[in-house]
């Protein structure tokens, strides 16, 4: 975070702004500071919630907070909490500024300076200074928004393997199946395609989100609005409100001591307070789980990283370890 040199107490201001950013990430709400309930945390950010302040070389400062204290207060205030488990999204961004000036965002562009104007395999004019500056501004705004919202973005390598499937025209033409094929190597939950049109009148971004069979589109004048849109969608699914409740989770296919590590899988989830073996019937392990949120949210998190697969043919929360291929299972819808 960059400190504001115009304020009298830069350190205190940085701590307050750090808490505001943290609350935006944790609650999943864009304007967290506008909620009266959250003023308690912002006003006391330098008190019992404060954990550390680091001022490394450069223009950035790092502020850390006590996660337990923050989460306890949010639970007491009945505010939403979005834990550490966050779906990764592949961002495929293509920009056309006219007159043959085209650019795509690639993985190497996370580190400045951005290599604008590189469109592998496509005849393209080098970007003018004006177009390069605009491309830089747009991409930085998108990456900054993703960081502020806590949305993990994966950028394509745009290497020979990617180019086997996807060309600039495929992204620009919204040929989703082609992009989806290329995205298989990246192991992501969603694909976010951004088509940026830059003209003398301004910038327009056409967004397409693919999540399984779902496809949604949005057109925005501001680059970050697509990121906020997707973050809001994820937050609605993954945030939990209130304290923990008891539920039962069945793990099918427990046949060795190695399989018992599924208990650690459950216990590691941010919404789970405890996961205790309740009974064993055959190779079915039933766990008594205290977790925030409802069963659907718990199921989404349990299958998010691919270690557990849901058994859809059974009612309730029934899963099997992904390393067990001899048990009927399928990915959740």
Language-model-detected regions and their locations in the chain:
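Amphipathic beta-strand/beta-sheet edge segments enriched in Tyr/Trp
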Residues: 3, 67-69, 182-227, 299, ...
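C-terminal soluble interaction/assembly domains
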Residues: 211-213, 219-220, 225, 234-333
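Solvent-exposed coil/turn segments that connect beta secondary-structure elements
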Residues: 2-4, 43, 56, 64-70, ...
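Extracytoplasmic/secreted envelope proteins and their assembly/folding machinery
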Residues: 12-23, 35, 39, 71-76, ...
């Amino acid at each position: 975070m960059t400190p504001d040199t115009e304020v009298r107490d830069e350190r205190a201001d940085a701590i307050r702004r750090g808490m505001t950013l943290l609350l935006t990430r944790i609650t999943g709400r864009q304007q967290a500071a506008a909620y009266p309930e959250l003023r308690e945390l912002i006003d006391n950010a330098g008190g019992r919630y404060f954990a550390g302040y680091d001022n490394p070389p450069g223009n950035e400062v790092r502020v850390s907070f006590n996660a337990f204290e923050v989460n306890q207060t949010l639970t007491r205030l009945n505010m939403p909490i979005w834990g550490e488990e966050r779906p990764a999204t592949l961002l495929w961004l293509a920009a056309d500024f006219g007159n043959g000036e085209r650019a795509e965002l690639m993985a190497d562009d996370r580190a400045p300076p951005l290599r604008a104007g590189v469109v592998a395999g496509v005849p393209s004019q080098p970007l003018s200074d004006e177009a390069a500056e605009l491309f830089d501004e747009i991409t930085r705004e998108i990456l900054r928004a993703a960081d502020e919202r806590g949305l993990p973005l994966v950028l394509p390598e745009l290497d020979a393997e990617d180019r086997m499937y996807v060309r600039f025209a495929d992204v620009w033409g919204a040929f989703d199946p082609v992009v989806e094929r290329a995205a298989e190597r990246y192991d992501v939950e969603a694909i976010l395609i951004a088509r940026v049109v830059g003209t003398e009148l301004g910038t327009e971004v056409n967004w397409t989100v693919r999540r399984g069979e779902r496809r949604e589109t949005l057109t925005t004048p501001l680059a970050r609005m697509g990121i906020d849109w997707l973050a809001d969608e994820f937050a609605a699914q993954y945030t939990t409100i209130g304290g923990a409740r008891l539920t039962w989770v069945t793990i099918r296919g427990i046949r060795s001591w190695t399989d018992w590590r599924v208990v650690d899988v459950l216990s590691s989830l941010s919404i789970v307070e405890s996961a205790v073996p309740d009974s064993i019937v055959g190779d079915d392990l039933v766990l008594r789980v205290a977790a925030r949120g409802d069963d659907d949210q718990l199921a989404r998190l349990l299958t998010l990283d691919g270690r557990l697969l849901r058994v859809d043919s059974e009612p309730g929360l029934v899963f099997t370890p992904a390393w067990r291929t001899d048990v009927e299972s399928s990915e959740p819808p």
